[in-house]
Curated annotation (Swiss-Prot):
Enzyme Commission identifier(s): 2.7.7.6
Physiological role: DNA-dependent RNA polymerase catalyzes the transcription of DNA into RNA using the four ribonucleoside triphosphates as substrates.
Organism: Emiliania huxleyi (Coccolithophore)
Major place of residence: plastid
Record-annotated membrane-spanning stretches: none
The name this protein goes by in its record: DNA-directed RNA polymerase subunit alpha
GO BP field: DNA-templated transcription
Annotated keywords: Chloroplast, DNA-directed RNA polymerase, Nucleotidyltransferase, Plastid, Transcription, Transferase
Keyword Mitochondrion found: no
Region called Alpha N-terminal domain (alpha-NTD), residue ranges: 1-225
Gene Ontology CC annotation, any one: mitochondrion
NCBIfam families assigned to the protein according to its UniProt record, in alphabetical order: PRK05182.2-5, rpoA
GO MF term (any one): DNA binding
InterPro entries to which the protein is assigned, alphabetical: DNA-dir_RNA_pol_insert (IPR011262), DNA-dir_RNA_pol_RpoA/D/Rpb3 (IPR011263), DNA-dir_RpoA (IPR011773), RBP11-like (IPR036603), RNAP_asu_C (IPR011260), RNApol_insert_sf (IPR036643)
């Protein structure tokens, strides 16, 4: 019977929620397929709220020194990247901070609307060393993934410094595949997926949302009016050079579960990392036998016309 179980769950800190899930039973080959799709969706397509720009009174550029403040503008921008917000925004909003020293300035000093929540109000921003005032404004937006300040700067009003926007609430995703046997003596797989979030969303909520995103995408593909035109002549096959595939994930080799898990445990995630090893090097990995080494070499040659050193 198909099931999704939560094997472990813990909150290590205000901005660190971790959980491990098991998805089973799966047919042979489905573990890597589903695991890879969920991992990419979790890291790239789960929305979150972040600061995209800030205005600091008396500051013209990010390298400015702020009178009476221990940190310069650049250090404050880096600290703002660490702030975690929970809540949905339909459009960008501006929030403010106005405080007099001497004091330590934290996230809780920011005046935010009631429908937004700061996950860690004690998150450090700056230190005012004398009786100076620190006045700041922040632009908050909702988005996905990670957007560099070079891209957020174009949408900010004049006088605002751009901030690298860490929208994604997902800090880390890992998965591996195990084999199991069913009552019908068929080889089955179970997918173990580990998710770590920043506290603005629970790992289970993130997993459900990623599954919904993928389900919606596949429904669109299934409902589309698909047509295809086939060429009358077979086009020449262009050989892929080694430099073209260095970033290709090892999932594209479609290896057995044993060979795949051994490579992942050895921190080999791309073909570029794999090509640094020889066949003899692979045999030195734990539980990596001659059969697995032969499989890696054969699939590497068949799919990409590449060989190990």
């Amino acid at each position: 019977m198909f099931q999704v179980q939560c094997l472990e769950s813990a909150q290590k800190a205000a901005t660190e929620n971790v959980a491990k899930f098991c998805i089973e039973p799966l047919s042979k080959g489905q573990g890597i397929t589903i695991g890879n799709a969920l991992r990419r969706t979790l890291l790239s397509n789960i929305p979150g709220t972040a600061i995209v720009g800030t205005r600091i009174s008396g500051v013209d550029h990010e390298f400015s020194v702020i009178p009476g403040v221990k940190e310069d503008a650049l250090e404050i921008l880096l600290n703002l990247k660490q702030l975690v917000f929970k809540g949905n925004l339909n459009e960008p909003i501006i929030t403010r901070l106005n405080i007099q020293g001497p004091c330590i300035v934290t996230a809780g000093d920011i005046d935010i609307p009631t429908d937004l929540e700061l996950i860690d109000p004690q998150q450090y921003i700056a230190t005012i060393t004398d009786f100076s005032h620190l006045e700041m404004e922040f632009i908050l937006e909702q988005g996905e993934s990670y957007v560099l300040s070079e891209k957020t700067a174009s949408n900010n009003p004049r006088g605002f410094l751009a901030v690298d926007a860490v929208f994604t609430p997902i800090k880390k995703v890992n998965f591996f595949v195990e084999t199991s046997s069913s009552k019908e003596r068929l080889e089955k797989e179970r997918l173990i997926i580990e998710i770590e979030t920043n506290g603005s969303i629970l790992p289970l909520e993130a997993l459900n949302l990623a599954a919904e995103r993928l389900s919606s995408l596949f429904k669109l593909v299934n409902s589309a009016d698909l047509t295809a035109e086939f060429p009358t002549e077979v086009e020449n096959i262009v050989q892929v050079s080694q430099t073209d595939v260095t970033g290709v994930l090892i999932e594209e080799l479609e290896l057995s579960v044993r060979a795949y898990n051994c490579l992942k445990r050895a921190q080999i995630h791309t073909l570029g990392e794999l090509l640094k090893y020889s066949k003899e090097n692979l045999l030195e990995f734990k539980n990596f036998g001659q059969k697995s080494a032969n499989e890696v070499c054969e699939n590497l040659h068949e799919r990409f016309n590449l060989t190990l050193n």
